UniProtKB/Swiss-Prot annotation:
Biased composition (Acidic residues): 84-93, 281-310
Gene Ontology process terms (BP): starch biosynthetic process
GO cellular component: amyloplast; chloroplast
Tissue: Expressed most exclusively in endosperm.
Name this polypeptide is given: Soluble starch synthase 2-3, chloroplastic/amyloplastic
GO molecular function: alpha-1,4-glucan glucosyltransferase (ADP-glucose donor) activity; alpha-1,4-glucan glucosyltransferase (UDP-glucose donor) activity
Gene that specifies this protein: SSII-3
Organelle targeting peptide span: 1-16
UniProt biased composition (Basic and acidic residues): 63-83
Biased composition (Basic residues): 102-116
Amino acid sequence: MSSAVVASSTTFLVALASSASRGGPRRGRVVGVAAPPALLYDGRAGRLALRAPPPPRPRPRRRDAGVVRRADDGENEAAVERAGEDDEEEEEFSSGAWQPPRSRRGGVGKVLKRRGTVPPVGRYGSGGDAARVRGAAAPAPAPTQDAASSKNGALLSGRDDDTPASRNGSVVTGADKPAAATPPVTITKLPAPDSPVILPSVDKPQPEFVIPDATAPAPPPPGSNPRSSAPLPKPDNSEFAEDKSAKVVESAPKPKATRSSPIPAVEEETWDFKKYFDLNEPDAAEDGDDDDDWADSDASDSEIDQDDDSGPLAGENVMNVIVVAAECSPWCKTGGLGDVAGALPKALARRGHRVMVVVPRYGDYAEAQDVGIRKYYKAAGQDLEVKYFHAFIDGVDFVFIDAPLFRHRQDDIYGGNRQEIMKRMILFCKAAVEVPWHVPCGGVPYGDGNLVFLANDWHTALLPVYLKAYYRDNGMMQYTRSVLVIHNIAYQGRGPVDEFPYMELPEHYLDHFKLYDPVGGEHANIFGAGLKMADRVVTVSPGYLWELKTTEGGWGLHDIIRENDWKMNGIVNGIDYREWNPEVDVHLQSDGYANYTVASLDSGKPRCKAALQRELGLEVRDDVPLIGFIGRLDGQKGVDIIGDAMPWIAGQDVQLVLLGSGRRDLEVMLQRFEAQHNSKVRGWVGFSVKMAHRITAGADVLVMPSRFEPCGLNQLYAMAYGTVPVVHAVGGLRDTVSAFDPFEDTGLGWTFDRAEPHKLIEALGHCLETYRKYKESWRGLQVRGMSQDLSWDHAAELYEEVLVKAKYQW
């Protein structure tokens, strides 16, 4: 048998004999396992011998970096008295020094920094290269692996596991007594053979810690849970390389111990390695504001984390939105509805919603791809096949419904007789309501949960009706909602009552369609039924919502709107700055035009004005005001009011440019004006997107004498380009154009209160006088108009509020 085995066996027998001679195991000592042997000097025998370390001396109650150690008197003091038989041995262990135990491989062993534990004595005694802690209490015997791996991971004192002390993981050595104050602890360098750790000194008095090798647990930071099982983060080696006075080795955590009920539990938290081992603290102390620096650093880190982890703008209100419209820019557009259907979905998608636009496929669109889905729907007694095409652009799914009824109607999407129009709209609404089930956008259909349909005008007013009659009344799509947007209530889908069977609805739904008015008598009104069935209703401006409640502005639906006023909201449209922005407008990058901003307004806009005059064959003059009109040629837009005021306009030193298409008699009127006043007037019959952009940029004034205008977009485009609007104060025009006040230097343009020629002449006269005589006030009007936030982002936020209301409406 080897000498090492003999020495170990001898030590174990000596420990058992010592325990038996003193009356067996006592409370306050670790029993059943011998302490690691130490080579000590035996004073009586006069030689070195392998002996177990003496029992611990009493330790006062003290606080060291947030860890409370408790030492009791009583039995522990008796054990210390018994341990004082050897004077030299007493000198060895009463000097206040203790040494972290070495591992079997020669490295520094594990140090327990738990509440109530006592630092163990080194395996080879207290001498040698161990660090000495001056002013510390006497050491405790080091437990072996069996003792240290008890179920609570702490040093037990001989009590049963079900006692409060053992459940606490504390070392209980006797009755509790008041703790005595202890001087601050300082630790000298530890020249351990593995990787010694030398923490930098600090100016302010505080205890320092020696971090053992990778096998030992690190002490917990102040205020943290010493029993937390969260591992330490790996330190940044580059940081430690810069600080020559410190070298830290990562250590593994000890098993987590539970607490007994009498002592309140400490909330567990993950250790912040950098915050605890404050290696930059000496530099901060020299600056005198170390706490503030670290507070600022923590604040900046939290801001960065918040930005990195920030969710969608919609927050918890993210939902699936399907916008259904008969037209959508840039594929098919006849008015403002096409702009809304093309821009609003992108703004909603930027807020985090999953958005789809469903529109008929009037032509061959290169972006759209056939998804391979074929469905059959009955419209006006016929079974018609429907195909679905899909394109993903700017975060929005665009789904095009293809059917023979829609093809080759790119230039006349609302044309045909009433039966043809009705058949197209019935087929479109039936196919659109089932799109979330059949079309796998991105491989995943939208489904009918957390879904809101956003229908637009009477062309899609049947969608809320079909959603309720076909699905919700039959227990399907219970969490799907519908919102109907009123862009122009003058078009309602009115027809005879005997057309109701073509819609293929239950008979009792006829009551929702029937309306009576003094002029047309009893009729079926599709828009009226949609307003009743929709969960929410939106108008394109607050002013237009007010007008719809009046007898004149409601166009026969004012009673229905008043009854459903509780679910109606007015939201002003926005503009798409990627298309309507003088700074990046692609139509201003050729033919002598120029892009400009507010800063370059004085140079860019005159260039556009001169280029427009040359392109249209007008005299290039910077001093003459250039007036523009862009719109549909019909009674609503009030172009005939301009015709009645033409004698006065022709007598002024001005230039007039009109662009639009519509009623034939009004188109002829534009051509006649150009022929009569060739040096001042230009009439462009038809619609050109490029010319609309160039007139908006080159004109000084834009006139909009609309008899009614739900919202209007041209006045928004004009103000964004620094063109001053002169409008009839109605609907959305009243909401978006505030009257100019020369005394307060406020306002965005001129307004008149009645759609009459003399009112237009009066407002236009004040405008021209300001242009000629008050250049500073005129430039203020331009700058204020260009400085507004007219984007769709603000409107999308308001639409989102309406969608949320519809979602939680039952």
